[in-house]
Curated annotation (Swiss-Prot):
GO BP annotations, alphabetical order: rRNA base methylation
Organism expressing this protein natively: Caenorhabditis elegans
UniProt keyword RNA-binding, yes or no: yes
Subunit record text: Homodimer.
Reactions listed under catalytic activity: a pseudouridine in rRNA + S-adenosyl-L-methionine = an N(1)-methylpseudouridine in rRNA + S-adenosyl-L-homocysteine + H(+)
Source domain of life: Eukaryota
One Pfam family named in its UniProt record: EMG1
Name of protein: Ribosomal RNA small subunit methyltransferase nep-1
Amino acid sequence: MSHEYDTVAPPNAKRMKTDNQLEDKKILYVVLEGCSLETAKVGGEYAILSSDKHANFLRKQKKDPADYRPDILHQCLLNLLDSPLNRAGKLRVFFRTSKNVLVDVSPQCRIPRTFDRFCGLMVQLLHKLSIRAAETTQKLMSVVKNPVSNHLPVGSRKMLMSFNVPELTMANKLVAPETDEPLVLIIGGIARGKIVVDYNDSETKISNYPLSAALTCAKVTSGLEEIWGII
């Protein structure tokens, strides 16, 4: 099952631009904010700092290991890019690190299944500023200029996902089925705390219980798939 799932071809980028951006505006933009993704030279090699592997190193640097959770970004990207919504060509993903590095993720990017391989890829991304497909020159991930609002559709509705707000919106009610416009959802790629941004129009929650970033990603993509009839 997993082998078959992993071999499903991702959407074609050129077709997506023609079919979706020009004809169908029903696209979900997800921005993962505050993601922990920081490199340092540990044991003679550059590595993505992680609370599990580098707790002693971080304490020596007088940093809290609990703030270094790149696994959250890994889980979120797996949920987003593996989703039927992405395979249908109706998802765009950006993430911004706690160091204010903004990254554009291609819908065709295949996220490594293992965390170690993911970290290796992220070291390459932060040092070379892009990741290219092995067989082509296509960029699968690239560092782009801030602000993120320059990369989002003009006039789009931008909602910040937050548990600490009274408004509750079911994931399958985030947009009306007949609404022909893109939606931007901002999700904190953090383990604790609150994300504060200056480009959202509103704040909402999709559950009466606190959700992890990865579960939030899974629920919103599932909700939009239901709204837009993607099976």
